[in-house]
């Protein structure tokens, strides 16, 4: 699906997104544990949609949450839902976005297959990690479906620092810098 088609699809789905959302709290908890979401961290939520994980980051005490989605309507809804000072919601392409600071944790949840150039995305996001930071790609599909091997190749190809990709469970793959 081309990028504009993805934007149009999610813009059209935004109004009813939260109503159709199915959450598995145990799986989400495990994903956020693997991602290192704990008090005081800075988080970048990539393809945040309507802010599905923002309440989880807040409950876990994240100091700063930056969320980005390419679909304007998704970003608008997330911005309205979370007006807190420590939450910033942006509309833009995460594979090209620039930020004033690095992040302790970057999470892509249920969105990785929608990126047309996943290697480029991972390479760009790896450069936004603070030392010791973790990039977590998580989806309801298996580790194999996530393309964890592709994630590993992209991370290793950056050549900046030590990149370790591990399949932490069947729901996510983590890149640690």
Task: Enumerate the language-model features and the residues they cover.
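Conserved class I S-adenosyl-L-methionine
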Residues: 1-38, 52, 136-159
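Short glycine-centered segments of the SAM/dcSAM-binding site in methyltransferase folds
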Residues: 42, 133-134
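Class I SAM-dependent methyltransferase SAM/SAH-binding core
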Residues: 44, 50-96
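A conserved beta-strand element that flanks and buttresses the S-adenosyl-L-methionine
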Residues: 107
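Short catalytic micro-motifs in class I SAM-dependent methyltransferases
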Residues: 110-111
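A short glycine-rich, Lys/Arg-flanked "PGG" loop and its adjoining helix->strand segment in the class I
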Residues: 119-131
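Short alpha-helix
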Residues: 161-177
